[in-house]
Curated annotation (Swiss-Prot):
Annotated EC: 1.1.1.79, 1.1.1.81
Principal place of residence: cytoplasm
Catalytic activity: glycolate + NADP(+) = glyoxylate + NADPH + H(+); (R)-glycerate + NAD(+) = 3-hydroxypyruvate + NADH + H(+); (R)-glycerate + NADP(+) = 3-hydroxypyruvate + NADPH + H(+)
Function: Catalyzes the NADPH-dependent reduction of glyoxylate and hydroxypyruvate into glycolate and glycerate, respectively.
InterPro entries per record: D-isomer_2-hydroxyacid_DH, D-isomer_2_OHA_DH_cat_dom, D-isomer_DH_CS, D-isomer_DH_NAD-bd, Glyo/OHPyrv_Rdtase_B, NAD(P)-bd_dom_sf
Organism: Salmonella newport (strain SL254)
Name of the protein described by the UniProt record: Glyoxylate/hydroxypyruvate reductase B
Keyword Protein transport: no
Keyword vocabulary terms for this entry: Cytoplasm, NAD, NADP, Oxidoreductase
Subunit structure: Homodimer.
Subcellular location: Cytoplasm
Length: 324
């Protein structure tokens, strides 16, 4: 008899068929308590769980006593209580490598859009305000040869540094938990403490996961240390930034602009002051959102679950100790 799994994400037919070749699949729309109750028997017998974005917590795990592996279609997993999974010997798989280049493209796009005011001036053209040759009120600032500060030198940070160094001749500063020799060798990146990076960088790009240590890492003190001409980019996790402090820094002219792919609360409230600022480019968590990359992420998550339930967790496992 095939192992049974719960699938809470719609997959392309070919990927669904791949799952069905290995498992008995129960598809559900979400992991809400009423959904779990409606499919109680399927949840109780499921050995695998696959999907994205929904909360996976102790309450859910209590309803899934047979669960052995969970596979998330994402690199981030702050919506998952990893400690609870580990305590129950449940491995968590994720999809870190397949989205690296696409997210780095998004960060670069935010840098260019904020610096050159692409969204702001495009909206003004559509509003009929382009009635004569443009003057300084429409100008942006250069990106090339400016200093880039990367906070979080993981895979995405490395891909961003490559674009900045080779494509835009940007000096690269970085701050991370440990020095990254490859970044220093390939891109002449300079390791520095966070305060130094904030004081020297023209672009501060945050690419950090959400942890107890990184929550509200950026607040009023950090924005005050940045240049008034600096552009702030967040493509990691929203709660890494104290959003009220960011709003104040923008309103008070402490920084020049911000490009934001993530927010403290998502979706972003329509009442957020950020949406009324012409120097803010706000996009709806599109970091990996291309057709190609999202397909590759789903395919990776499918393969991860198949591997995990066969005892293969050599790659993409968040908590390998759970299998011990």
């Amino acid at each position: 008899m095939k192992p049974s799994i719960i699938l809470y994400k719609t997959l392309p037919d070919d990927l669904l068929h791949r799952l069905e070749a290995h498992f008995t699949v129960t598809q559900v729309p979400n992991l809400h308590p009423e959904t779990v109750a409606r499919h109680a028997q399927a949840f109780a017998s499921a050995q695998g769980l696959l999907g994205a974005s929904e909360t996976v917590n102790r309450a859910l795990l209590e309803k899934m006593p047979a669960l052995r592996a969970a596979s998330t279609i994402s690199v981030g997993y702050d919506n998952v209580e990893v400690d609870a999974l580990t305590a129950r010997k449940i491995v968590l798989m994720h999809t870190p490598a397949v989205l690296t280049e696409t997210v780095a493209d998004t960060v670069m796009a935010l840098m260019l859009a904020t610096a050159r005011r692409v969204v702001d001036v495009a909206e003004r053209v559509k509003a009929g305000e382009w009635t004569e040759s443009i003057g300084p009120a429409w100008f942006g600032v250069d990106v090339h040869h400016k200093t880039l500060g990367i906070v979080g030198m993981g895979r995405i940070g490395m891909a961003l540094a490559q674009r900045a160094h080779f494509g835009f001749t940007m000096p690269v500063l970085y701050h991370a938990r440990r020095r990254h020799q490859e970044a220093e060798d390939r891109f002449n990146a300079r390791y520095c403490d966070l305060d130094t990076l904030l004081q020297e960088a023209d672009f501060v790009c945050v690419i950090l996961p959400l942890t107890a240590e990184t929550r509200h890492l950026f607040g009023a003190t950090q924005f005050a240390r940045m240049k008034s001409s600096a552009i702030f980019i967040n493509a990691g996790r929203g709660p890494v930034v104290d959003e009220n402090a960011l709003i104040a820094a923008l309103q008070n002219g402490e920084i020049y602009a911000a490009g934001l792919d993530v927010f403290e609360q998502e979706p972003l409230s329509v009442d957020s002051p950020l949406l009324n600022m012409s120097n803010v480019v706000a996009v709806p968590h599109i970091g990996s959102a291309t057709h190609e990359t999202r397909y590759n992420m789903m395919a990776c998550a499918v393969d991860n679950l198949i591997d995990a339930l066969q005892g293969k967790i050599e790659k993409n496992c968040v908590n390998p100790q759970a299998a011990g």
